[in-house]
Amino acid sequence: MTESTPLSQLPWQVTRDEFLRSAAEVTSGGACCVFVIDDAIPKMARSGYAALVIAYARADEPVCILDDGAAALLVRDGGTASGRAVANRVLEQMRKLALDQTIRAGVASLGSDPSASMRAARDAATAGPAGEISVAS
């Protein structure tokens, strides 16, 4: 990856529009997980975090990398309980690499407006402590 390649164009990911379309197809029980990278991590290093989230996601869990390097992951069923389980799986892998204190996870139920759900999950992640999972209320 060159320095000029935007974070939002990593391979093996879905675009924001594809993510939102897929989320809109979930009729009930879905969740959105957002992983926010600490501001202390240089922008150039954030693609590595995004690639790890993609690597730890399952085939049926689309991942969208946002412009600032945050990663949104779609959980199709099981609601916030499944969302927490997915976020925990990713954070456990990050912990093995000693990266868990530089990333935060937020989970929100998938409602009728997937974009709002993504924002709620991101807000929960931003407000939560490093290495932890926060659930939007």
Summary of predicted features, one role per range:
Residues 31-33, 65-76, 99-124, 134-137:
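A short glycine-enriched loop-to-beta-strand structural element that forms part of the catalytic core
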Residues 41-48, 80-85, 116:
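Short, conserved charged micro-motifs
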Residues 17, 21, 25, 85-92, ...:
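CheY-like receiver
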Residues 15-39:
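Active-site-proximal structural segments of metal-dependent nucleotidyl cyclase/transferase enzymes
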Residues 24-27, 49-80, 92, 96-98:
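Conserved helix-loop-beta segment at the catalytic/binding core of cyclic-nucleotide signaling proteins
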Residues 1, 88-98, 102, 136-137:
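Regulatory sensory/coupling modules that transmit signals to nucleotide-handling catalytic cores
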Residues 1-16:
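Amphipathic HAMP/coiled-coil signal-transducing linker helices
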Residues 2-6, 34-47, 57:
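Active-site loop/short helix in cyclic nucleotide turnover domains
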